[in-house]
Amino acid sequence: YEKKKTKQQDDTHKDKIFNYGYQGKYNWTYDTTSNYQLKFDETQLKYYLDYQGPQRSSVSYERSELNPTTANYSSQVFNFRGTEESIQAAQGDYAFVNGDRPQSINSLFSSTGRQFNGYVITETTQLRFASSFSADFKNHAIMVGVEYDQRNLSGYTVNPIGLWERMRNLTNIHLAEFDTANPIIIAGTSGSLEQRYYRYLYDASKQNQIDKSLREALGLSVDNQSLINTDAFSPDDLKLSMFSAADLLQTGQVGSALVDYYGFDYLGNRDKNSTNLDKFLNDKDDKGNNTLHVGAYKPIYVAGYIQDKFDFKDLRFNVGVRIDRFDANQKVLKDPYLFQEAYTAGEKSEGKPGNIQDDYVVYVDNFRSSTPEVIGYRHYDEKTNTNTWYNSEGKEVSDPKALLGADGKLSPWIKDADFADKNPFSVNAFKDYKPQINVMPRVAFSFPISDIASFTAHYDVLTQRPTDGIMRFDPKDYYFINNTSSNPFLTNSNLKPEKTIDYEVGYQQVLNQKKNAALKLTAFYRELRNQITTQTLSNAYPKTYYTYVNRDFGTVKGLSAEFDLR
């Protein structure tokens, strides 16, 4: 049994993640009463003053000594300027605001004061049992062995410097439009014009958890319409729990996901449970936010082997077989082109052409329609990782664009359209990983041709498990796939071991009477199967993406010569 835990962090700030990238307080206020514009009311035939929204005052800077080198940049700017018109203007004058750090020099060298941006915890446990037995029986040397290996891999990562910009981007965005239908009329007096003041339209659906938490920290109600200045908070005022998991994981935001985790929750607390997709989609915290728990990666490897070395007349044999069983112990997509449940031709057989098999996926013009029209079918070959497309008449089509639906996309006939509109994937679109059993025979023999020459040959099969990083199942990737503007890259939890089949023959001969010189010639042929490569899964639903697949096949042929002189 072995347990290993590592932690990578800044040597000064350590786990105080809001200290990373903090430069100080940037203070400003909002004038919410005087920003009006003269307008004419065509209905009432009179002029009035129309409210145009709050105006922000100039920005002042209150230095912090947590990161003194980068704070020097900002101090120099504000000592010269006094104030700046905005945060963006300060950045334009090369001041660093919270969440900034100096850029690298030509992507080669770190600039003075460039802050380390990372807080990483990894935890790995391994339970391994191995046993072997050997015995000589007459002219046989027999060896038998078994092996069991179960690992538990967990990891947690925060990119803390980006937290400040993420707060800036996620606050106040629910207060974007004025409630012009319900103006507050301030009647004009003594010849002054009527003023029309507007409150914001409060859009609760767009209010992020960090916005709610900051308002609570300021003693404000959640629906208060004050505009928050996130750069006026100090690190001591903030906790990571003020964010929701979605706040930190939103890949549509600048800087992408700021946390990553498996075997931990998004706050860095150890979570020993396995990934449960139903809980991932539905479990919520006490604030009503999805917790998005991801369990540890727990692959299981079992192997057994037997080997026999023996002589038969002049032949010397080494014969054995090894059987490996690899279980990734995680969920995989039933069909890598579908994140939702879709009807097959067997389930919607009316009008099905005779050559269309029952397991082919049905495609329609609009799966949200009560009477969708079938426009084609798709057959996925798991062995070759390829699709074959057919039109509604059962004729094979080379370009699936011919099957585009009413929305300009290839639309599988989704079983539950309402669920698909609200959830990025369905639990029922996944299945358990099928354990891979590999039988690896090994045969080698040699025999003397004469006192000075011999011949050798062997046949060998080897397999190699996929590395953890390219096949660990992470439901967060599927959950946020629609937040990305480009086609994302997802790991493939359904990868199989790579296989090498090796054939080799050799000839060796002593070249002189002293027997201190020898020549060895070897010829070999290798087949490389199930090689892992990248592939674009075009027209997947809900989005095209890139991933790893077992697809490549290769052969290696060679001839070697070796001269040995002693």
Each language-model region and where it sits:
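Structural signature of Gram-negative outer-membrane beta-barrels, strongest in the C-terminal barrel
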Residues: T124-Q126, M143-V158, W164-T171, L175-F280, ...
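Short strand-coil-strand connectors
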Residues: D136-K138, K313, N512, R566
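Outer membrane beta-barrel strand-and-loop segments of large Gram-negative receptors
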Residues: R128, T484-K496, D502, K514-R566
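Extended low-complexity acidic/polar segments
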Residues: Q8-Y51, R196-Y197, A204, S213, ...
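Surface-exposed beta-strand-to-loop junctions
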Residues: F109, A420-K422, N539-A540
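Phosphate/oxyanion-binding active-site loops and adjacent basic polyanion-contact surfaces
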Residues: I121-T125, Y297, V556-S560
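Outer-membrane beta-barrel domain signature, strongest for Gram-negative TonB-dependent receptors
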Residues: Y1-L163, K515-K520
